Structure formats: C-alpha cells, structure tokens
Amino acid sequence: MESFNERVEKLRNLIETSDHIIIGAGAGLSTAAGIEYGGERFKKHFADFIKKYDFTDMYTSGFYPFKSEEEKWAYWALHISVNNVDMPATGLYGKLLDLVEDKDYFVITTNVDDQFFKSGFDPDRVFATQGTYAKIQCANACHDTLYDDADFVHECIEKTDADLKIPSELVPVCPVCGREMMPYLRADDKFIEDEYWHERSDAYNNFVLDAKYDKTLLLEFGVGFNTPIIIRLPFDAYNMNFKNWNLARFNRSHLEYSVNIEGRYHLYPLEASSRLPEGIMDSYLPFDEDMECIIDKLLE
C-alpha cells in the first residue's frame, strides 16, 4: 500500500478531475462523526436501561424482546431522540459536504440518522435505503403512510416512569388496522418502500447508469458486512467493471476487496492483492486512517 500522503494526493486529484462522485455511507461514518452506539455515550444516555436490562450498546439493545409496547417505546423513544430527532448535524458530515458540494454527486446510505439531510446535502441527491428514525410505520405494513415521530418521541421521554414504561395511552397503534407500530427501519419484509423510496432508488440507479462511461469516483465510508449487498459489493463490482471508475474505501478494519466469481463472492485482503484481477489496485485506494483527518487534509 502506498504511503498515506501519496494516497491522499492521489485522492485529491481524483476528486478534482472526476466527472461524478458517488458516496456510499455506512455506520462507520456516523461513528467517526461521534454518533457512537456504545461506550461513554451509551452509558450517559441509557444508564437506567443498562441497570434494568443489562444492555451493552444501542445496536444489540435494538433487538431486545421487550415484554410490552409500553417498555418497547420507552426505550425506542430515547434511542430515536439520541440518534436522530435531537441529534444535530455533526462536523464530519459538514466537512464531507464541503468536499463534494461543487461536484456532481449522489449519496447512498444505510444510515438512519438523517445526518446527510441535517448537514445540508441536497435531498434530491440522497438515497437512504434503510429508512429513518424520524418516522414510524404500521408494523404489519397494512398501508404505506409514514408518520413523523418527533412530538411523540418527546412526549414518551417526558412521561416515561420509574419502571421505564410509557403510559398505555401513548402507545402508538396503526390508524388503519389497529395493530402496533414500529420505527421506520428495515428489519424484515414489512419495511415500507413507498413512492418516495422508489423515487430515490430510481434517481440513484439512473445516476449510476448515466455515469457509467464517465470518470467517476466512489467514496465509501464505514461500510462493513452487515448489509454488503447494498453498497460494498456493488461498489467493488462497479470499480472492476467500469473502465473510468475509481474506488476510495475508508474503513478502520475491513479493507478487503470482493470479487464475484461464478456467483460467489471472494474477499481479498490487501496482503493478497496480487491475486486480484489485473489493474484493480490501480483504481482502488484503501484508507484505514481516521476519516476526519483524511477529509481535513483533503480540504487544505
């Protein structure tokens, strides 16, 4: 791997000379921005829940089988508040906008914290594939209306009692079928892909197609292997198959490159890069350094 400064300068040149930039963002970007799901931030906001349920972080606690809707929404209201509704724009996302705002860019993200919108990215250039904490939906997906949840979240937090339950009358129920509601997050086949979702999906896919033969830079931030089929695997394929494309991957621990061979994905760590198809490493820039430090250097 080239030196840090060499990679930064190469990336600087690619940003300046590329016709299009596609940003792919996963949880690692928000973690780098300070929206951590564990550690002191988790302990600060969820001390009572940790004491009652032995929670260890916000990711695993999201799968906890609460015994009642009153308990479930006491937790989720605080989770949604801390990570979206009452979480302002972060500096790192703002710097990322500074880096690309004068370019023809598009964002695809699996994050549900709305940081791209809060930080001033053009909403018409963002596709949030997995939903948003800022809305709730019918858990049975009986209809495709989504509901803003900010006022509901604040009232739940205000009225959560010592047993970490909200009043029964606050529990949201679907206005159509009368069943329970859930945060608007992709968890199963009940996730609602409404008209707006499909508009954003089409806009992203059209952007990719229109850029196919142009010089295009893929910037992938903090994407792991929870849902690699959305960003990571396609980015590797685009970079390998589209002649004028380049990929910069920012990841503290996963810089592997994936190659689809007869329908099966094979991962190649950097130390095995010599086994990759010829030319791949000429268009692949891996970074395991601090994301904000890299962006700061690019903005100099």
Label each PLM-derived region with a short phrase.
Residues 1-300:
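Conserved catalytic alpha/beta core of Sir2/sirtuin-type deacylases, generalized to analogous enzyme cores
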